[in-house]
Amino acid sequence: MTFQASHRSAWGKSRKKNWQYEGPTQKLFLKRNNVSAPDGPSDPSISVSSEQSGAQQPPALQVERIVDKRKNKKGKTEYLVRWKGYDSEDDTWEPEQHLVNCEEYIHDFNRRHTEKQKESTLTRTNRTSPNNARKQISRSTNSNFSKTSPKALVIGKDHESKNSQLFAASQKFRKNTAPSLSSRKNMDLAKSGIKILVPKSPVKSRTAVDGFQSESPEKLDPVEQGQEDTVAPEVAAEKPVGALLGPGAERARMGSRPRIHPLVPQVPGPVTAAMATGLAVNGKGTSPFMDALTANGTTNIQTSVTGVTASKRKFIDDRRDQPFDKRLRFSVRQTESAYRYRDIVVRKQDGFTHILLSTKSSENNSLNPEVMREVQSALSTAAADDSKLVLLSAVGSVFCCGLDFIYFIRRLTDDRKRESTKMAEAIRNFVNTFIQFKKPIIVAVNGPAIGLGASILPLCDVVWANEKAWFQTPYTTFGQSPDGCSTVMFPKIMGGASANEMLLSGRKLTAQEACGKGLVSQVFWPGTFTQEVMVRIKELASCNPVVLEESKALVRCNMKMELEQANERECEVLKKIWGSAQGMDSMLKYLQRKIDEF
């Protein structure tokens, strides 16, 4: 086959000459007219075209191999040809159609190119593989040890026996390394003096990072969970305060909180007032429903802590570069008083105190008298120390689900009137703590706020909400009257019509709707919620504490007495409802509906 084309030759790339391609398979021959070719290899088997037979014939150029491949501006494939007998400076780019008789060279180049790509991919994989990194470290360590160890030069039977024993011991140690790590996680820390509390999310579902601990720790990767459940060395070295608590409370304080029970126990059949036999008469009877509550309750369910290894203990400064919501999986206990808290986490920050709801005695950060007392204690401590303000948030994807009705019903079966009085008194003291607190209270609502969890928000000074949060006060559905001074504050901030719609019909408000009605100050995007909150909190904490406190006093001076009176009225009504058979029946019906929904 003969093909004519105009290209830059291998001898003069700036001069255009006619190249003629012909010859047997796997050969590419170039002939330059009227120019003598440099010395090079020739092939006597090459035939010359008839029109060139009379002229002086330069030696034919033979393809040695294909060096590279590219696409030209027109999208056509070109190959970089290495000519036999010439160096790399004389390589030329040839179109694919010029190499029709050189298919074997092209196939060989494509094969080598594919193998190089596979090798490069394998190399990158090996470089990024942690197992490979460990193997390389192990190899380098062993090689260095063999080079530097003087004992490697000793030869003898005694030495061999010693080396074999040492090798067997080392192999045994390596085999037992992994089980020792897992067994170390189950060790009992009660005797070690190390006091830790690792709060976990009370919500089972795992969601995206949308605020303060929006991910459930139970569903995190084991590696990630192990990294987050660490304790700073300052915590491990602190003085034990186990004497302050009883044995049960000590175990509960140190324990983790697996969510092995549903929000309400499964009870076959409908729940009616008839099931609570004796409740309507003297409040001391029992029922199958209450037996199920007692058997399946989660109040006293605690387990030992999973354990902490020394290698995982890092200073808190090492975590400054991590997102704030990740660092909330553990609490830094800097004072002995912080160890008293089981259902909340308290962090003393620079200029403010951070209180996080992380209930172990209830589900979904619900409020019972124990949780309320701990929040009150933390607020009292913050009021007396140098904190300029308080940040209130929650661990998990739920901010607060209101009152813990399972806790209430379990205790109302003993003495309904006495227990209803105690519970109403607990709510009254809890709400009064917010009313009388002199320093600013900032709330970061990362998820749903229901019942009392929503009604206390107007008692705080600033409320920032995650866009995924929502607000609802379905008191009529609960079978109870409003609480948390919502009968006064809701009409003031959103008007009578909207307040009645929330308090009577239980309308659910989105974060944007709550912001529009004045219940929420600002709404932030879930992905940057914690960052936005912390930036603003630090700005407030940099202000003069006297100015902050006096400014709040001026805003609340005309409302304090009115709120205390409203709180007193609401608690009296709650005590009356909870002490009646109708109120108990309504609460049981609500729990039955929750069971059916679950």
Swiss-Prot record:
Annotated region described as Interaction with EZH2, given as residue ranges: 61-309
UniProt-reported outcome of changing S521A: Abolishes CoA-binding and ability to inhibit histone crotonylation
Tissue: Expressed in the hippocampus with reduced expression in epileptic tissue compared to normal adjacent tissue (at protein level). Ubiquitous. Expressed at moderate levels in all tissues examined. Isoform 2: Most abundantly expressed isoform.
Positions where N6,N6-dimethyllysine occurs in the chain: K135
Basic and acidic residues composition bias: residue spans: 65-76, 112-121
Alphabetical list of PANTHER family matching this protein: CHROMODOMAIN Y-LIKE PROTEIN (PTHR43684:SF5), PTHR43684
GO biological process, one term: negative regulation of peptidyl-lysine crotonylation
Protein name in UniProt: Chromodomain Y-like protein
Subunit structure: Forms multimers and multimerization is required for stable binding to chromatin. Interacts with HDAC1 and HDAC2 via its C-terminal acetyl-CoA-binding domain. Interacts with EZH2, EED, SUZ12, REST, EHMT1 and EHMT2. Part of a complex containing at least CDYL, REST, WIZ, SETB1, EHMT1 and EHMT2. Part of a complex containing at least CDYL, MIER1, MIER2, HDAC1 and HDAC2. Interacts with CHAF1A and CHAF1B; bridging the CAF-1 complex to the MCM2-7 (MCM) complex. Interacts with MCM3 and MCM5; bridging the CAF-1 complex to the MCM2-7 (MCM) complex. Recruited to Xist RNA-coated X chromosome.
Domain-level remarks: The chromo domain recognizes and binds histone H3K9me3, histone H3K27me2 and histone H3K27me3.
Encoding gene per record: CDYL
Catalytic activity: 3-hydroxybutanoyl-CoA = (2E)-butenoyl-CoA + H2O
GO CC annotation terms, alphabetical: chromosome; cytoplasm; nuclear speck; nucleus
Biased composition (Polar residues): 44-56, 122-149
Boundaries of every Chromo domain copy: 61-121
Disulphide-bonded residues: none
UniProt GO MF annotations: chromatin binding; crotonyl-CoA hydratase activity; identical protein binding; protein-macromolecule adaptor activity; transcription corepressor activity
Gene3D superfamilies: 2-enoyl-CoA Hydratase, Chain A, domain 1, 2.40.50.40, Lyase 2-enoyl-coa Hydratase, Chain A, domain 2
InterPro entries: Chromo-like_dom_sf, Chromo/chromo_shadow_dom, Chromo_domain, Chromodomain_CS, ClpP/crotonase-like_dom_sf, ECH/Chromodomain_protein, Enoyl-CoA_hydra/iso, Enoyl-CoA_hydra_C
Key words of the record: Chromosome, Differentiation, Lyase, Methylation, Nucleus, Phosphoprotein, Repressor, Spermatogenesis, Transcription, Transcription regulation
Positions bearing N6,N6,N6-trimethyllysine: K135
Region Acetyl-CoA-binding domain, residue ranges: 362-594
Modified residues (N6-methyllysine): K135
Enzyme Commission designation: 4.2.1.-
Phosphoserine found at: S88, S170, S201, S216
Region annotated Disordered, chain positions: 1-76, 112-149, 204-226
Organism: Homo sapiens (Human)
